[in-house]
A protein has these predicted regions:
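Amphipathic, oligomerization/interface secondary-structure segments
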Residues: 140-148, 160, 164-166, 175-201
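Residue-level detection of beta-strand scaffold positions
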Residues: 73, 79, 109, 133, ...
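Canonical positions in the second alpha-helix
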Residues: 47-48, 81-82, 115-116, 160-161
Length: 201
């Protein structure tokens, strides 16, 4: 589908271009560029993607790969542009909040995620991200009252997120927050393997 020339530039295989949409081709191109490195991703962002207005999945994919590459500021720029065209797209806003959190703008990320939770109170991804920002705010806090508040909220949102799909990620974090609060009784609803993972870490 995508081929590399000897100069490491990306080019599309013309045999399949008529079978899938332009946005799907770009998503495949982004995924291929991610394997090459940051320079290839930047070339896409500054070249074939930025001047055009594609489907939100293109911005989601590109923003996500920049985050995975450890470039939250560039990821933020990508996702912020995507949000201008799709202001209600949930995934773009979730990734935008993650980019903010990873960039150190924890409060801004927290406020955005609070808005998303109001819209969809039972979305595990949003609840888990909101919990993560409260965990970060707990770490950053200097006042005891603020530390207690954010630790309690982190535990609360991780518990809520876990109850939706019972995923490993939210389960381990919920168990960790329970122990940090000194409330081992909160571990009872969680599988023993999550508590064991926390005790051993």
């Amino acid at each position: 589908m995508l081929e590399f020339t000897e100069s490491r530039e990306l080019r599309l295989n013309p045999e399949i271009t008529g079978q899938i949409s332009e946005s799907q081709l770009l998503i495949q191109e982004i995924q291929a560029a991610a394997k090459v490195g940051l320079s290839a991703l930047m070339a896409l962002w500054q070249g074939s993607i930025r001047p055009q207005r594609h489907q939100p999945e293109v911005y989601q994919t590109l923003g996500d790969v920049f985050l995975l590459a450890g470039e939250p500021l560039i990821g933020y720029d990508v996702l912020a542009e995507g949000r201008k065209y799709w202001p209600q797209n949930l995934r773009i806003r979730q990734l935008l909040a993650l980019a903010l959190a990873r960039s150190g703008a924890t409060i801004s990320a927290n406020l955005l995620l609070q808005e998303l939770v109001k819209e969809q109170p039972r979305n595990e991804e949003t609840l888990g991200l909101l919990a993560r920002t409260h965990k970060d705010l707990w770490i950053q806090a200097t006042a005891t009252a603020s530390q207690r508040l954010h630790l309690r909220l982190a535990a609360q949102y991780y518990q809520q997120a876990y109850q939706i799909n019972q995923s490993i990620w939210t389960g381990i974090n919920a168990a960790t927050m329970a122990l940090l609060q000194g409330k081992p009784s909160m571990l009872k609803p969680l599988p023993s393997r999550y508590a064991a993972s926390v005790w051993c870490s």
